[in-house]
Amino acid sequence: MFSKDTYISRRQELKKLVKSGVIILFGNNNSPCNFPNNGYYPFRQDSTFLYYFGQQRDGLVGVIDIDNDIETLVGDDIDLVDIVWYGSVDSVHDLAEQVGVHNSAPMKSLKTICNDAMSKKRKIHFLPPYRHDIKIQVFDLLGIHPNQQKDEASMDLI
C-alpha cells in the first residue's frame, strides 16, 4: 500500500478531470465456491478501486462526490461469524482513514447516496462492470439493465 497522501493526490486529480457529479468505484467481492466465505479463487481487488482507494478487502465501494467535495468508503464491518473465517480485521472507518478518506458508511447507505444524486439530476459516473455481481449491484442502485451498463458507463472515467 502506498502512503495516504498518494491516494489523496490521485483522487484530487480524478476530481479535476471529471469536474462534477458523483463517482462510484466498485471494489470486487469475493468469489465463493459453495459457501459465502469459501472463496474459490485468491481475492484480487479491482485495479481502479485499488488505485484510488488502496484497500484489498472485498465488499467495498469508493464514492467521490465532486460537487460537495466528500469522499466516502462504503462497506460493512465484518460480524462475529466472519471473524471465525478472517480473524480480526480493521473496521471500514479505519480502512478509510488509512487512505485519507474521512467518511465511511455501511453498504445500505449506497442506495441513499445514489437516490439523492439521481433525485437532484446529478451525473453518476461508473466504469463498465465486468463481474456479474457488480452488474446486479449497478442495476439495483441505478436501475440500469446489465445489457445497457457498458453504454451508460462514464466516458470521463474511461
What do the PLM-derived regions correspond to, one by one?
Residues M1-I158:
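A composition/biophysics-driven feature that prefers long, compositionally simple stretches
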